Swiss-Prot record:
It holds the Pfam family Ycf15. GO terms for cellular component: plastid. Keywords: Plastid. This is Putative uncharacterized protein ycf15. Its main location: plastid. The keyword Plastid applies. Belongs to the ycf15 family. It comes from Cuscuta reflexa. It is found in: Plastid.
Amino acid sequence: MYGWYELPKQEFLNSKQPVHIFTTKKYWILFRIGPERRRKAGMPKASIISFTRPNPVWERPVPKSLTGLFNVLYLLG
């Protein structure tokens, strides 16, 4: 993505950077959502953080007492 577009220094100082929305085969679509539009739409302030957090349920390891049981059920299934 570096080098595809240039922003003046003032944009970086104001922390108004384009947001990557989606990619097509030929180009990327970028746009900025201002704070007023975010408030109107009811967007949460930390939506990126909340959607990229790992799910704690998926991160839990299987207890050793159940590991053998899962192997047996897999072989029988």
